[in-house]
């Protein structure tokens, strides 16, 4: 959902290594697995301030810079196909299922979703060059906007909430066809509701 929201906005989207696979934080269970000096120092500080080892590790799992330094997960083999040697830092345990090889074989994967987002930016001039018009909504968890270039228009609606939300009436003005969504759907136009963290990208139909 976040990728859909960012890639349909103005500007140049940035993809950090592994984001396009849904790579996760490291999930280390022992401080010896960390390499970042600030993380290991902060771990000791937290212990001195009364945190348990489990509490300190939980905090590092959310905040440590090492979460963004784990090797690229190419496949489910040894060291995720990154190296035949010993990597500088260990991999998350989920690399056997979250990796390039597995996601290239699955058209419903996060990797395929990112590829389609990039393709839409190339195929639709309104996304790459158009203006942006935000749509007012009564729900702060709904982000909706139009990208407009001449007669071309792209509508993007995103639910940042953990519950199903109604699509604002202002998004239903005009006829649209669905370009991309992060849920499987038979709907062809603007839906009445968005599921939790659902994102839909639609193109205005020409008359």
Residue ranges and their predicted role:
Residues 66, 139, 172-173, 196:
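A short, polar/charged loop/turn motif at coil->beta-strand junctions and beta-hairpin connectors
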